[in-house]
Amino acid sequence: MSLNYLDFELPIAELEVKIEELQNVSRAGELDLELEEEVSKLKEKSDRLKEKIFSELGAWQVSQLARHPLRPYTRDYIERIFTEFDEFAGDRTFANDPAILGGIARLDGEPVMVIGQQKGRGTAEKIKRNFGMPKPEGYRKALRLMEMAERFKMPIMTFIDTPGAYPGVGAEERGQSEAIARNLKVMASLKVPTICTVIGEGGSGGALAIGVGDRVNMLQYSTYSVISPEGCASILWKSADKAPLAAEAMGVTAKRVKELDLINNLVDEPLGGAHRNYDAMARNLKVRLKRDLADLQALSLEEMLDQRYKRLMSFGYCS
């Protein structure tokens, strides 16, 4: 499959094209020892180059990776981490919003509620999923599932990946801001373990609406910000061309957000990013989720809620 190489990955692309050409020769039955050694050397060179390039990424390059069209989405993680997923639909008020995917699943046999934003792959699915931008009915569906999880004492695991809540007229008329605010309020006091993970873009209130939890994690090349770099650049410099500068200034990367103590953990991605190896990324994330869940289940309800309250109240505190 084509990896849709980003600009900074072009040197890697050249090597990988050479590797693929040699492997095609191999598949044609013309492989000899000399050719096999050449492929091995090129792979080693490619890995070294990837390590060098990805160790020096700037905030804008990380933003590009967070939006990579082949990056694994919520459904990809559900298929690899959980079993027996049973999707629920509708907010019982207005409609079903395909931008929010949610339902009951099992994590190594334990029932959990899984909720996440879902972007689309092809044009038709992108339109169906509204490019991962939920409407009020999506957030109300998420709230319905979270309250159901609390009622049945199931842990909640959310996957955040959105450029932001949908800003259309219809969404505003149906109470977009109220839906987000209500989710924040309810999530702050849920009486079950809640683990949130930013898997791609964490866009403003649209991300926060399913992002209040006991543990908040970010994948290594995900982002979290109040506005997109392009949006910030358009406001401050009147030009979206300044997006790289805005990305650096806002500190959108997982590393920077962790330095500010706004999240709990970083989850390492495979060399070259999550889009290069879905299975390896899912394994890394599953380890993190199970560890977080075990830690939270070891606490009493009072201890868990107290820790959550203290964590939330520490945001924005300056000594």
Swiss-Prot record:
This is Acetyl-coenzyme A carboxylase carboxyl transferase subunit alpha. Coiled coil: none annotated. One of its GO terms (cellular component) is acetyl-CoA carboxylase complex. HAMAP family: AcetylCoA_CT_alpha (MF_00823). It holds the Pfam family ACCA. GO terms for molecular function: acetyl-CoA carboxylase activity; ATP binding; carboxyl- or carbamoyltransferase activity. Keywords: ATP-binding, Cytoplasm, Fatty acid biosynthesis, Fatty acid metabolism, Lipid biosynthesis, Lipid metabolism, Nucleotide-binding, Transferase. Pathway: Lipid metabolism; malonyl-CoA biosynthesis; malonyl-CoA from acetyl-CoA: step 1/1. Component of the acetyl coenzyme A carboxylase (ACC) complex. First, biotin carboxylase catalyzes the carboxylation of biotin on its carrier protein (BCCP) and then the CO(2) group is transferred by the carboxyltransferase to acetyl-CoA to form malonyl-CoA. Its EC number is 2.1.3.15. It is an enzyme of class 2 (transferase). InterPro entries: Acetyl_CoA_COase_a_su, ClpP/crotonase-like_dom_sf, COA_CT_C. Its main location: cytoplasm. Acetyl-CoA carboxylase is a heterohexamer composed of biotin carboxyl carrier protein (AccB), biotin carboxylase (AccC) and two subunits each of ACCase subunit alpha (AccA) and ACCase subunit beta (AccD). It comes from Pseudoalteromonas translucida (strain TAC 125). Residues 34-295 form the CoA carboxyltransferase C-terminal domain. GO terms for biological process: fatty acid biosynthetic process; malonyl-CoA biosynthetic process. It catalyses: N(6)-carboxybiotinyl-L-lysyl-[protein] + acetyl-CoA = N(6)-biotinyl-L-lysyl-[protein] + malonyl-CoA. The lineage of its organism: Bacteria, Pseudomonadati, Pseudomonadota, Gammaproteobacteria, Alteromonadales. Belongs to the AccA family. It is found in: Cytoplasm.
